[in-house]
Curated annotation (Swiss-Prot):
GO terms (BP aspect): biotin biosynthetic process
Protein name: 6-carboxyhexanoate--CoA ligase
Species, as recorded: Sulfurihydrogenibium azorense (strain DSM 15241 / OCM 825 / Az-Fu1)
Protein origin, superkingdom: Bacteria
Main function: Catalyzes the transformation of pimelate into pimeloyl-CoA with concomitant hydrolysis of ATP to AMP.
Record pathway: Metabolic intermediate metabolism; pimeloyl-CoA biosynthesis; pimeloyl-CoA from pimelate: step 1/1
Lineage of producing organism: Bacteria, Pseudomonadati, Aquificota, Aquificia, Aquificales
Amino acid sequence: MKEYFSVKMRASLQGRHVSGAERIVLKEDLPTVISQLSQRPKEYDSLNIKVEKINDLNYIEKSLNVKTINVKDWIEGNKVAVEILQNQGVDKKIAEKYINLIHQGAVNGENMRGAMIVNLSGERVEKDKTRGIRTVNIDFEDRKAITELLKEKGYTERTVDALALATKTLNHPDIVAEYCISDDPSYTTGYVATKTTYYRINPLKQLSNEKGGRIYFVKDTANIEDIYQYLESEAFLIKQLGDLQ
């Protein structure tokens, strides 16, 4: 019987998070993956790798479809993002309010550590507004093949990771859409995910902006405890890649 393990890497520099990654791999692949993840961060003074056996593994048949939208600047990119969110039932003013919050950062000037959860009435409903919520315990069953397919189409390792996270997130019945920008000041591509599609929007934030984060838009009737259990505790592998548009 196959034994799967979760491998999580977190690196920080002077107390600031600089790199993170996660894999779900077979036991025999642990040495290789641990070595790869330890070499991923460029500069750090603290590196932590956590390995845990997975006893209950679930599967998602296919990832979200991928569509790239190139725009002239980040302002236009966010107009496109808001339109996509509106098509999922998110009110325009609510979408704009929380997108602006992501671009400006938390009240203390720092990035939000996890995702915000915002219901369709515009209320933030995550249990801890400082910590937020994280989607973890997700990977592709054949990550190598999926990565090669995406790279052939001009995508990067970032896309592999983000697509896996978004696919798990939007697989929950109460989550209707996601908005995400990186906190890397040099990386301006972001995305909006819906039930069917991962919209990669370039650019979605201003160059040199160090702010970043995620918003999960959920139904007003969403069971928040169930969302936390699903996103943070349940493990999934994705079997196939969706359509590349």
